[in-house]
């Protein structure tokens, strides 16, 4: 059994992590921390977890206790993992960070986007970007894993086959993405109130979203060079889900794009390339660690449209974190994650 610790268990990614790990046969959650909720039982805060964590209570973070775990997940705001990750790594504990702290390889770029100096730049060279469909082999031997963000996961998985094959015009990529309100976190915000978010949709951060440099970094790796990306996120009146509509110019009309995508993801347990002509729905991935993709070439022209959907809390966060843990410790990648999506 793997002894697991969780730092920051009171947000949506934290409770989703608890839900997924409760179904995992090789895991014992030994400690979960929250300074504000120390002493509160997990099952009292989250009634859906009654019968799974009845003896577990939130506690103040203690490096010695966390350092006794095989792996510690950080489900925290950015900046928190900077302070603790190095100490845990020195104790021999593996770290899987769901925040943005180690996703960008350039500390100065991270500081520009997150408005504060990077707190552990010395750890960036060894941080492995935890997108299994790209970095599976590096994940196996990692000490520190940076779990990708929700928008970056859906966008990169949608674009990868076109960029890796050299088919797309890398200078003119567009990602038009929609997110459920849970992507804004559990904290009280006016824009997340029911009366504000219901029956309305809006674009935001068009000038520049924090996920833009992360997406661009991944697409550059796939393309082997610079890319030009326009990324426009939207907030939609649903709780869970990311729907990415991706546009790329592909001049070669002789390529069988359906076959290209099917071949690229044939061995990937959590990427579903849907039949030609499909339109994946966010409800088809709700609660599941899967990305569903459909590729289109409207009117047979040069513009290719890729539709990519995920659950932002699962494949876009906690589910992908568990997938990384499974790979890291040599377990079946599907362990604890094989359940179907919820309908309706």
Curated annotation (Swiss-Prot):
GO cellular-component term (any): cytoplasm
Enzyme Commission number(s): 1.2.1.38
Gene Ontology molecular function terms on file: N-acetyl-gamma-glutamyl-phosphate reductase activity; NAD binding; NADP+ binding
Subcellular location: Cytoplasm
Gene Ontology biological process: L-arginine biosynthetic process
Gene3D superfamilies per the UniProt record, alphabetical: Dihydrodipicolinate Reductase, domain 2, NAD(P)-binding Rossmann-like Domain
Highest taxon listed in the record's lineage: Bacteria
Classification via CDD domains: AGPR_1_C (cd23934), AGPR_1_N (cd17895)
UniProt pathway: Amino-acid biosynthesis; L-arginine biosynthesis; N(2)-acetyl-L-ornithine from L-glutamate: step 3/4
UniProt xrefs under SMART domains: Semialdhyde_dh
Active site per database record: 150
Catalysed transformations (reactions): N-acetyl-L-glutamate 5-semialdehyde + phosphate + NADP(+) = N-acetyl-L-glutamyl 5-phosphate + NADPH + H(+)
Keywords: Amino-acid biosynthesis, Arginine biosynthesis, Cytoplasm, NADP, Oxidoreductase
UniProt keyword Chaperone, yes or no: no
Record Pfam families: Semialdhyde_dh (PF01118), Semialdhyde_dhC_1 (PF22698)
Entry similarity comment: Belongs to the NAGSA dehydrogenase family. Type 1 subfamily.
Role: Catalyzes the NADPH-dependent reduction of N-acetyl-5-glutamyl phosphate to yield N-acetyl-L-glutamate 5-semialdehyde.
Protein name: N-acetyl-gamma-glutamyl-phosphate reductase
Organism: Azotobacter vinelandii (strain DJ / ATCC BAA-1303)
């Amino acid at each position: 059994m793997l002894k697991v610790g969780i730092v920051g268990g009171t947000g949506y990614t934290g409770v989703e992590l608890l839900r997924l790990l409760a179904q995992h046969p090789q895991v014992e959650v030994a400690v979960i921390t929250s300074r504000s909720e120390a002493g509160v039982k997990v099952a009292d805060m989250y009634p859906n977890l009654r019968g799974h964590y009845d003896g577990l209570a939130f506690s103040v973070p203690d490096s010695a206790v966390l350092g006794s775990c095989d792996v510690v997940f950080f489900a925290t705001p950015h900046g928190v993992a900077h302070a603790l990750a190095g100490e845990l790594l020195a104790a021999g504990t593996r770290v899987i960070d769901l925040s943005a702290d180690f996703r960008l390889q350039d500390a100065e770029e991270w500081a520009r986007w997150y408005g504060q100096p990077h707190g552990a730049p010395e750890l960036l060279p060894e941080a492995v970007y935890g997108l299994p469909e790209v970095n599976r082999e590096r994940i196996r031997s990692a000490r520190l894993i940076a779990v990708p963000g929700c928008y970056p996961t859906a966008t990169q998985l949608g674009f990868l086959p076109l960029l890796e094959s050299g088919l797309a015009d890398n200078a003119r990529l567009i990602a038009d993405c929609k997110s459920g309100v849970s992507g804004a976190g559990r904290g009280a915000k006016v824009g997340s109130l029911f009366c504000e978010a219901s029956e309305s949709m809006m674009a935001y951060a068009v000038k520049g979203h924090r996920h833009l440099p992360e997406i661009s970094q991944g697409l550059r790796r796939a393309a082997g060079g610079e890319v030009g990306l326009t990324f426009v996120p939207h907030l939609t009146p649903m709780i869970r889900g990311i729907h990415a509509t991706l546009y790329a110019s592909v001049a070669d009309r002789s390529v069988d794009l359906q076959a290209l995508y099917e071949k690229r993801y044939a061995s990937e347990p959590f990427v579903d390339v849907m039949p030609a002509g499909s339109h994946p729905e966010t409800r088809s991935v709700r609660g599941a660690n899967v990305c569903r993709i459909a590729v289109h070439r409207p009117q047979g022209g040069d513009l290719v449209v890729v539709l990519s959907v995920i659950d932002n809390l699962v494949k876009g966060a906690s589910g992908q974190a568990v997938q990384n843990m499974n790979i890291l410790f040599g377990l079946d990648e599907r362990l604890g994650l094989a359940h179907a999506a919820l309908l309706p």
